[in-house]
Swiss-Prot record:
Transmembrane segments: none
The protein's name in its UniProt record: Pre-mRNA-processing factor 39
Main location, first listed in the record: nucleus
PANTHER family: PRE-MRNA PROCESSING PROTEIN PRP39-RELATED (PTHR17204), PRE-MRNA-PROCESSING FACTOR 39 (PTHR17204:SF5)
Keyword DNA-binding: no
Organism: Mus musculus (Mouse)
Bias kind Basic and acidic residues: ranges: 1-11, 599-622
Keyword set, alphabetical order: mRNA processing, mRNA splicing, Nucleus, Phosphoprotein, Repeat
Species classification: Eukaryota, Metazoa, Chordata, Craniata, Vertebrata
HAT repeats: 107-139, 141-173, 181-216, 218-251, 331-363, 365-397, 402-434
GO CC terms: nucleus
Length: 665
């Protein structure tokens, strides 16, 4: 999209407080049961999507049963074309944009509901589209449904100041004006809004809207109470709020700004000061109760003194808050895109800024401020798993359910195809003793993104750690069976053979796995190396025949000449060090000389330009192995250092990436 979601409604009409006699009054349940308090993150297990539940089911569970007037067969003519595009590729954001634009233009309610509901399963952070959806319901006079859409949106993105403002304007338009219940509902909504989003650095317009509304109602004491809160929160317009607060104090009488208790306490404080100066008698003898009129003789002086003291108290709050703002200002200026977008961040700098800001807040801020900053971060960087992982890691020291909630949102909504987040979620559940939940997370992800070796191996290790050896073996056998290439099949065969030999202590079965793999992938050096390593682990005297058979398979097989010579040299060394028959040693030596002559012949042909050297046709890793082994020979290492040879081939982890493309984002 060319325009950001945050900008879509920047110039839109925020609504008015106009009357609407045709709209029925809507009864609003208690917000506390419906709007997530992002400062706590103490979610119950039922509040977070289950690891094995469908994401769509989780999202749709929040929707009300909406009455419709159109049958599905009456969908607009082009709907199916747009729908198939996003159904085939839910990550095609442009396809979603075209679909939603189309259903809006057609003004087809049922088609719009289907499109918007499915869209928000994948992109719940697009605040502008929640507004579009709610407006669509409202245009069809579905006030209750519009209200529900707003509530679902605020559950999905409770830090959206703009969405809160749109919702409050919606309530002003649709609730009965002048009704006490209406005021209670709106004030309650304001309270939930500032609890959820009021500590956001850019939440000023929400606070200002709250203050203006209380002023309109004539609730000066409530205005003061709101100022008491905002003047202690680091926000972008902190200085503006303090200036408006001073105007609020100067333009109204102190007794109208303060509660009765605050008013009495302030008068006593000032009277006490005057008493010490000798101006008045003991403050307790002649102080009024605080509710009768102030003496005309003292009226002007006392009012000004009280105003001065009120501002003085709040000046201290302002000074401290200004210091807190200054510590965060540079970080806030570095946030160029505070809203969600599918496009990557333009440069590395925004990511670095987020990381440094989070580290600063973790070190210096309260838990509430840290959580709010993380929530802001994962809106802007929702498609970057590193920030979700950092968030979950932070929550480990505060709330087990908080960790689970973070992982659940990341994996089921925003990062359905990112392996690391899923693997860490599964590991977390395993740590908590939820073994079956860990299984489900890994299995579900593997079904979503096929062919990831790292996930299959994590499933195997999970079963092994908990004593399910048969299941671990079955998972590896299944991976061999469904491998897309011989190379992949050989990789899993090596893993299975090592599992059978090291864990289950079943040498014959392990040997069979590797021999079968060699028959299918005769040029894979790793198979021979692992077979040799396994045979060497047994009694050398009793297992001499199997070791020699392994050498012969490599020497007489399809490996490049250089690797065959290497195996031949190792065979000679083995017979020299451990062999029981000198005839076998002499035969091995003669065979080795024959291979060297064959290599010389090939080199001469290559030098004459008649044939490409065979070793250049080999895999890079096989050539590297041969070069290392040749280096050992040149160093005159008499001992058969098989351990070093084996380790060389596993210096670098297996390249899982060759079996799957990077998951789409």
């Amino acid at each position: 999209m060319q325009n950001s979601h945050m900008e879509e409604y920047r110039n839109s009409d925020n609504g008015s407080t106009g009357n609407s006699s045709e709209v029925a009054v809507v009864e609003h349940p208690d917000f506390s049961t419906e709007i997530m308090n992002v400062t706590e993150m103490e979610q119950s297990p039922d509040a977070s999507p289950s690891a094995h539940a469908s994401t769509e089911e989780n999202e749709m569970a929040n929707a009300v049963n909406l009455p419709v007037t159109e049958a599905e067969g009456d969908f607009p003519p082009e709907f199916e074309k747009f729908w198939k595009t996003v159904e085939m590729n839910p990550q095609d954001f442009t396809g979603w944009v075209y679909l939603l634009q189309y259903v809006e233009q057609e003004n087809h309610l049922m088609a719009a509901r289907k499109a918007f509901d499915k869209f928000f399963v994948h992109y719940p952070y697009c605040y502008g589209y929640w507004k579009k959806y709610a407006d669509l319901e409202k245009r069809h006079d579905n006030i209750k449904q519009s209200d529900e859409v707003y509530r679902r949106g605020l559950q999905a993105i409770p830090l959206s100041v703009d969405l809160w403002i749109h919702y409050i304007n919606f309530l002003k338009e649709t609730l009965e004006p002048g009704d006490q219940e209406t005021n209670t509902t709106i004030r309650g909504t304001f309270e939930h809004a500032v609890l959820a989003a009021g500590t956001d650095f850019r939440s000023d317009k929400l606070w200002e809207m709250y203050i203006n509304w209380e002023n309109e109602q004539g609730n000066l004491r409530e205005v003061t109470a709101v100022y008491d809160r905002i003047l202690g929160i680091p926000t972008q317009l902190y200085s503006h709020h303090f200036q408006r607060f001073k105007e609020h104090v100067q333009n109204n009488l102190p007794r109208d700004l303060l509660t009765g208790e605050q008013f009495i306490q302030l008068r006593r404080e000032l009277a006490s000061v005057n008493g010490h100066s000798g101006d008045d008698g003991p403050p307790g003898d002649d102080l009024p109760s605080g509710i009768e009129d102030i003496s005309p003789a003292k009226l002007i002086t006392e009012i000004e003194n009280m105003r001065h003291r009120i501002i003085e108290i709040h000046q201290e709050m302002f000074n401290y808050n200004e210091h807190e703002v200054s510590k965060r200002w540079t970080f806030e200026e570095g946030i160029k895109r505070p809203y969600f977008h599918v496009k990557p961040l333009e440069k590395a700098q925004p990511k670095k800024n987020w990381k440094e800001y989070l580290e600063f807040e973790i070190e210096n801020g309260t838990h509430e401020r840290v959580v709010v900053l993380f929530e802001r971060c994962v809106i802007s960087c929702a498609l970057y798993e590193e920030f979700w992982i950092k968030y979950a890691k932070y929550m480990e020291n505060h709330s087990i359910e908080g960790v689970r909630h973070v992982f659940s949102r990341a994996c089921t909504v925003h990062l359905p195809k990112k392996p690391m987040a899923h693997m860490l979620w599964a590991a977390f559940e395993e740590q908590q003793g939820n073994i079956n939940e860990a299984r489900i997370i890994l299995r579900t992800f593997e079904e979503c993104v096929l062919g990831l070796a790292m996930v299959r191996l994590r499933r195997v290790s999970l079963e092994r750690r908990h004593g399910n050896m048969e299941e671990a073996e079955h998972l590896l056998q299944d991976a061999i069976k469904n491998a897309k290439s011989n190379n992949e099949s050989s990789f899993y065969a090596i893993k299975l053979a090592r599992h059978l030999f090291k864990i289950q202590k079943n040498l014959p079965k392990s040997r069979k796995v590797l021999l079968e793999a060699i028959e299918k992938d005769k040029e894979n050096t790793k198979l021979y190396l692992n077979l040799l390593e396994m045979e060497y682990s047994c009694d050398l005297k009793q297992n001499e025949e199997n070791i020699l058979n392994c050498f012969d398979k490599a020497i007489h097989g399809s490996l490049p000449i250089k690797m065959r010579i290497t195996f031949s040299q190792r065979k000679v060394e083995f017979l020299e060090d451990f062999g029981s028959d000198v005839n076998k040693l002499l035969n091995a030596y003669d065979e080795h000389q024959t291979l060297l002559k064959e290599q010389d012949t090939l080199k001469r042909k290559a030098e004459n330009g008649s044939e490409e050297p065979e070793e250049k046709k080999a895999h890079t890793e096989d050539l590297s192995s041969a070069q290392i082994i040749d280096g050992d020979l040149q160093a005159n290492q008499a001992a058969y250092n098989y351990s070093a040879w084996y380790q060389y081939n596993y210096q670098n982890p297996w390249n899982y990436g060759q079996y799957y493309p990077p998951p789409p984002t």
